[in-house]
Amino acid sequence: MQPTVTLALLALIFGLTASAHHSAAAFDRSKPYEMTGTVHSFLWANPHAWISVDVPDGKGGSDTYELEGPGLNGMARSGLTGHTLRPGDKIKVVVAPYRDGSKRGEFMAIFKDGQQLKF
């Protein structure tokens, strides 16, 4: 009986860890907003894509936002690649902001050249 209980507890612990990794609790999806800026960098790496976007700050400078995206498998099935976005591209992004107010978030939609990139 002891090995069964131990095995069940381990399965529960590892299951909770995996669930926490895929949690969207850090993002406030109830307050999405749009931003327009220039791609600083685009990282196509497992488990998620990342975009750094330079957004004008209204004072002549810019702020860089770090945006996390969905898993690569889904994006690739939609035809996106690691070369879809390049530094210097002008994009509009719909973002779910981080709850802590930092310049980070989750990209929910991307528009490039007036067209929405599907993923």
Language model region names:
Residues 35-39:
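Conserved hydrophobic positions within beta-strands
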Residues 77-92:
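Short nucleic-acid-contacting surface segments enriched for D/E, G, S/T with interspersed K/R
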Residues 69-77:
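Short, structured beta-strand/loop micro-motifs enriched in basic residues and often containing a Trp
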Residues 4-17:
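Bacterial N-terminal signal peptides
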Residues 58-70:
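A short macromolecule-binding patch
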Residues 18-33:
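Short boundary/loop segments of OB/S1/cold-shock single-stranded nucleic-acid-binding domains
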Residues 45-56:
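Short aromatic-glycine-enriched beta-strand elements
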Residues 98-119:
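OB-fold/S1-family single-stranded nucleic acid-binding modules
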